[in-house]
Amino acid sequence: MTGVAIEAHGLGKTYGRRGGGHRALDDCSFRLPAGRVCALVGPNGAGKSTLLNLAAGMGRPTAGSLSVLGSADPGDVRDRTAFVPQDKPLYPQLTVADTLWAGAELNPGRWDRATAERIAGPLARTARVRSLSGGQRTRLALALALGKRPELMLLDEPMADLDPLARHELMGVLMAETADHGTTIVMSSHILTELEGACDYLLFVDGGRVRLGGEAEDIVSAHALLTGRDGDLSPHTVVESRTAGRQLTALVRKEGPVDTTAWAVTEPSLEELLLAHLRSPDAPPLLTPSASAGERTGVASA
């Protein structure tokens, strides 16, 4: 799949009374190309869940615009998107078999029964949803989402309830979905090591805005870990620095060549990079060209 999956311009969302409410998103602008597996990362309260809800058409922004799969109204493309929120809302009185049947009935012409049955795999079909564990409900919710054959999957902390084996299995399924069908996946998670091996795109949200955005590889390569005696870090942008004894370790955003005579230079892991930015909320933003929003095409705020 080519094109743009999600694009935001000055996106804002405030909950509560105007002027005195909670601002979950504030002048948030970015672009997500289609066909990527995107890690949506940030501290608690950064706006990740709000962004996913808006992209799923579960609300309207109070400022700016949000385009999903080319539509200025995300609600118009719900049949082409799948959303698994944190609370996995399923009907507790239904059985697993009833739930899968409902998925097929609600998605005529798109339903992939074989995929849904494969993901639901070990779940007893006669078991009622209310009797399932958190991890089992997650598996059923993902079976519904993948069975829909969406062009865009929005997953809010999807793996938190899963044991390591199930997590590994379902991450493999998600990767295959992108490789085989070009599905765009946006996945929020606090398990940074898991994201590093699975995601090729990054949106780091803090304070209601995207602070880092682009190809994960490009964002990592734009930074360096410098270790050495306390010295001059200019002209590089310092994201975080720490001193232990007479040795300084700094994560910098490179502005030209690094003086290797003064510093030992290594490339940070994605986890090291994200942890440093989590500890340094005032670090300047970085959006690669692919993540920079283009010209505004319309306004979809309330």
Describe the predicted segments one by one.
Residues 41-43:
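The feature captures the beta-strand-to-loop junction immediately N-terminal to the Walker
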Residues 56:
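Helix-to-loop junction immediately C-terminal to a conserved catalytic motif
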Residues 63-77:
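Conserved ABC transporter NBD signature motif
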Residues 87-140:
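ABC-family P-loop ATPase nucleotide-binding domains
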Residues 153-157, 162:
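Catalytic Walker B motif of ABC-type/P-loop ATPase nucleotide-binding domains
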Residues 168-252:
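ABC transporter nucleotide-binding domain
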